[in-house]
């Protein structure tokens, strides 16, 4: 349903990532409290997979979705999960080219590691900060790609 109401153009990419930052930060804050050990182990396995897929952007994007999905589920709020999925899906249209670049994938992996570490420490504030920083990095790399004429 969100896709029906939002049509993304360059001028509102910043609004999308502002919304994602708010949602992902709160989701991470809640997940730091609510995630169980199985979900944390799942995240750790996903990160291992991401290290192995850095040279395959399509595979990395799949594992990126699984990483975020596990955190959305771990937040314990099904509505936040659905909102996170919708905002993530909207961003993919603009993210595809940026996420082909090795330096972008490496930065995402570093961001994911920092977020995982905060979640593992059960530190809601650090988890929220890590999620928000990740969204800032995603936004920056997306806009860098846009300024190079490459949003697809």
PLM regions: where:
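Residue-level signal for pocket-adjacent positions within structured domains
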Residues: 3, 89, 100
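Non-transmembrane, amphipathic alpha-helical segments
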Residues: 8-12, 35, 100
């Amino acid at each position: 349903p969100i896709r029906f109401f939002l049509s993304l153009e360059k001028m509102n990419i910043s609004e999308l990532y502002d919304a994602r930052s708010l949602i992902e930060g709160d989701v991470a804050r809640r997940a730091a409290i609510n995630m169980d050990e199985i979900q944390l182990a799942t995240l750790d396995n996903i990160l291992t997979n991401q290290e192995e897929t850095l040279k395959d952007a399509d595979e990395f994007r799949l594992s990126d979705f699984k990483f975020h999905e596990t955190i959305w589920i771990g937040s314990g709020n099904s509505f936040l999960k659905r909102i996170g999925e919708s905002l993530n899906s909207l961003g993919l249209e603009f993210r595809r080219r940026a996420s082909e670049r090795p330096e972008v994938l490496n930065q995402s992996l570093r961001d994911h590691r920092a977020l995982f570490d905060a979640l593992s420490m059960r530190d809601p504030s650090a988890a929220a900060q890590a999620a928000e920083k990740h969204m800032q990095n995603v936004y920056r790399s997306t806009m860098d790609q846009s300024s190079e004429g490459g949003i697809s």
